[in-house]
Every structure is written in structure tokens, then in C-alpha cells.
């Protein structure tokens, strides 16, 4: 019997940002470039149904609505920011929620523009995640994504995770849940300065523990490199697999350099500019 495979997304709206809209847009690109089914877990299923419908998804899983969130600032370029809730809890529930034997977990602001990640389903690796990353500006300090803190362990991105259902991987995701529940203990143990819970940190700590508290081979590298733009940058234009970014100049607040990508999948951290582009794209369908 062949194994089932697909992409899994979470979408929890926070009053400032429409993650459901992001998920709908990303699902369309996943079907186009990766050609695999997409499942969505959301706390806004009625909004999804009434606004966009569910045709873009293989399965929609209803999550309980909660106001629990981490407050943080969301930037829209260098000169604008808004405070909102960051509903990033329970990402590790993907192991139990996913209907697939082989799952590619993605953030909704990870804009697929090629078929590179389709190769993970043919890989022999049971757990894959990005450690290698690159700022598309190629000109800014990237140290914050090397370690979870200056003198702590290696940083891994929870933005993209591939896993197969197995007892070992169940142990990993149960461990991430435990780290989330006891975050303040693990934050102090691993010398993380920020009080804000981040899945990147929790996944990094869990990988360190799974490796026996030393460098190891539990997590294998996803294909390619995790490219990203900061929330101080602006996604300005999109045309199929081409994107134009205004990348903030370091030490020159409010000044930008235009950077164009083609066929490059990018983690777009400025979700406001992403939303403006999505509105244009969906209006043109």
C-alpha cells in the first residue's frame, strides 16, 4: 500500500493579519509547483468557508478558538509597525493532526516558487528541517539565525519541516510539546534572552536533546537553502515565480534597495506587504 503524502498548514487569525487568506494563496501555489494535496488546521473554519471556500484543501481541521497569544510587533517595512497577537502555540500537534504518512509542514508566509521541496517525498530521511539560511539582501548580519542565542545551540527553522510518521518522530513532537509547556525552564537552561516562545527555538532545543545533547544526525537538511526577507523589507511585486522586494538598507532607516528573484522560494516575514500582494493576485483570478 502506497504511503499518503501532503502539505500541512496552520492558520490562526489575530485581528491584524489574515493567515487564512495566506493559507488559501499558498495552497494554490503548492498545487501548482509541488502537485500534492494540502490540509489546513484553522480556528476560523466558518470564515474560511464563507470567504474563500474549501476547494483548495484536501482536508480542513477545526481548531478550538482561543485568545491566548504572544503579543509582539509586526513590521510593515522599516517605518511602520503594529502590535498584535502571535498565535504560534501547538505547532507540534501537526504529528497527530496530519492525515498523511509523509508530511511537509509549512508556514503560510513561505512562498513556494519552484518544485525543489517535492524531492523530500522521495528522500530516505524521516525528518528534515532547514539549518542553512540566507537573507536575500546578501548584505546584512545573519548571526541571529546561527544560534538560538550567542553562546547556545544551533538554530533550526520551524518554518519548513518534513517528517514521516514513526515512533521516533512521535517522540520528537511530544518533546516539542513538553518544551512549549515548560518554556521558561528551557529558556533559562538554553540561555535564550527572549521571553517570547518561538517554535524555531523549541524545535532547535528538541533536536539537540534527540541528538543526545551533542551534534548528531537526527535532523537532516532540507534541499537547497532557506531564503528569507526581514519584516523591515517590503514585497513590492509578484508575477508567477518572479518577486520584487524592497530590501531595507542596513544603517539607513527608510531607504531600500530593489531585489528581484525568479524561481526562488522565499520566507516573507513582512506579512502586511504579503497580504497586499495576495489581494492583487486573488482579485486577478
List each language-model region with its residue ranges.
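Residues at the starts of beta-strands that form the adenosine-phosphate
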Residues: 36-38, 102
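Glycine-rich phosphate-binding "P-loop"
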Residues: 4-18, 67-78
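Short, polar loop motifs at secondary-structure junctions
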Residues: 42-48, 65, 112-114
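Conserved catalytic core of nucleotide-sugar-dependent glycosyltransferases
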Residues: 120-182
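A glycosyltransferase accessory/donor-loop signature
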Residues: 1-11, 20-21, 40, 51-56, ...
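Short, acidic, metal-binding catalytic loop of nucleotide-sugar glycosyltransferases
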Residues: 26-36
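GT-A fold catalytic core of metal-dependent nucleotide-sugar glycosyltransferases
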Residues: 87-138
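Active-site-proximal specificity loops/subdomain of glycosyltransferases
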Residues: 47-98
Amino acid at each position: 500500500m502506497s504511503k499518503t503524502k501532503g502539505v500541512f498548514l496552520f492558520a490562526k487569525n489575530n485581528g491584524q493579519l489574515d493567515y487564512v487568506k495566506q493559507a488559501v494563496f499558498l495552497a494554490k501555489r503548492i498545487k501548482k509547483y509541488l502537485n500534492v494535496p494540502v490540509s489546513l488546521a484553522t480556528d476560523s473554519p466558518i470564515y474560511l468557508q464563507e470567504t474563500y471556500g474549501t476547494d483548495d484543501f484536501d482536508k480542513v481541521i477545526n481548531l478550538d478558538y482561543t485568545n491566548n497569544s504572544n503579543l509582539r510587533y509586526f513590521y510593515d517595512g522599516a517605518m511602520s509597525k503594529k502590535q498584535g497577537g502571535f498565535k504560534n502555540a501547538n505547532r507540534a500537534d501537526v504529528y497527530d493532526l496530519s492525515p498523511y504518512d509523509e508530511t511537509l509542514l509549512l508556514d503560510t508566509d513561505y512562498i513556494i516558487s519552484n518544485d525543489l521541496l517535492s524531492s523530500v517525498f522521495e528522500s530516505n530521511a524521516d525528518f528534515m528541517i532547514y539549518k542553512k539560511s540566507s537573507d536575500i539582501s546578501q548584505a546584512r548580519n545573519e548571526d541571529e539565525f546561527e544560534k538560538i542565542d550567542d553562546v547556545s545551540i544551533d538554530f533550526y527553522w520551524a518554518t519548513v519541516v518534513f517528517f514521516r510518521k514513526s515512533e521516533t518522530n512521535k517522540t520528537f513532537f511530544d518533546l516539542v510539546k513538553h518544551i512549549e509547556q515548560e518554556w521558561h525552564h528551557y529558556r533559562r537552561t538554553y540561555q535564550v534572552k527572549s521571553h517570547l516562545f518561538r517554535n524555531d527555538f523549541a524545535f532547535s532545543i528538541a533536536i539537540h536533546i534527540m541528538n543526545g545533547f551533542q551534534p548528531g544526525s537526527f535532523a537532516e537538511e532540507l534541499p537547497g537553502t532557506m531564503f528569507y526577507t526581514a519584516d523591515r523589507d517590503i514585497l513590492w511585486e509578484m508575477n508567477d515565480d518572479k518577486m520584487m522586494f524592497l530590501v531595507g538598507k542596513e544603517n539607513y532607516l527608510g531607504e531600500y534597495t530593489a531585489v528581484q528573484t525568479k524561481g526562488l522560494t522565499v520566507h516573507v516575514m513582512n506579512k502586511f506587504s504579503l497580504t497586499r500582494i495576495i489581494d492583487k493576485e486573488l482579485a486577478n483570478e
